[in-house]
Amino acid sequence: MDWLDDVKWDAQGLVPVIAQEQGTGDVLMLAWMNREALRQTAALGRAVYFSRSRGKLWFKGEDSGHAQTVHEIRLDCDRDVLLLRVTQQGHQPGIACHTGRHSCFFSRLGDGAWQAVDAVLKDPRAIYG
């Protein structure tokens, strides 16, 4: 039996993936993987996701230079969520979000409204052109 068969894939053949920074424990982002993305991530030691909007593999950092080196891949108790422990590359501190922030989780609910609480580290126009 292939180790990929132990994962509970959804009806579209995908599984959600949380990327967590190895050194700080910061939650960087949530993305999706299909079997090939997970296979390549394990083989290459760098994060490869599946882009639902583009319908293809997405090598994290291929456009931005902000790749993720994968140190550990974990599967949750229900076998339907993955956790990647990563080092975020390309900037210090690492930029995981396409908005130029460290984490995609930069909005906090307060007083009935979402507020951006984390600074933009690099203008996205400078990242993506």
UniProtKB/Swiss-Prot annotation:
Keyword Plastid, does the record have it? no
Instruction: Output the InterPro entries linked to this UniProt entry.
Output: PRA-CH, PRib_AMP_CycHydrolase_dom, PRib_AMP_CycHydrolase_sf
Which of the seven top EC classes does this enzyme belong to?
Answer: hydrolase
Q: Which UniProt keywords are present, listed alphabetically? A: Amino-acid biosynthesis, Cytoplasm, Histidine biosynthesis, Hydrolase, Magnesium, Metal-binding, Zinc
Answer whether the UniProt record assigns the keyword Mitochondrion to this protein: no
* Residues binding Zn(2+): 77, 97, 104
GO terms in the biological process aspect are:
L-histidine biosynthetic process
Question: What cofactor requirement does the entry state?
Answer: Mg(2+); Zn(2+)
A GO MF annotation of the entry reads:
zinc ion binding
The UniProt note on the cofactor reads as follows:
Binds 1 Mg(2+) ion per subunit.
Cellular component (GO) terms are: cytoplasm
UniProt-listed Enzyme Commission number(s): 3.5.4.19
Name the reaction it catalyses. Answer: 1-(5-phospho-beta-D-ribosyl)-5'-AMP + H2O = 1-(5-phospho-beta-D-ribosyl)-5-[(5-phospho-beta-D-ribosylamino)methylideneamino]imidazole-4-carboxamide
Residues that bind Mg(2+): 76, 78, 80
PANTHER family (UniProt xref) = HISTIDINE BIOSYNTHESIS BIFUNCTIONAL PROTEIN, HISTIDINE BIOSYNTHESIS BIFUNCTIONAL PROTEIN HIS7
Q: Kindly state the subunit structure of this protein.
A: Homodimer.
The entry's family comment says: Belongs to the PRA-CH family.
Show the HAMAP family listed in the entry: HisI
Designated name of the protein? Phosphoribosyl-AMP cyclohydrolase
Lineage, opening ranks? Bacteria, Pseudomonadati, Pseudomonadota, Betaproteobacteria, Burkholderiales
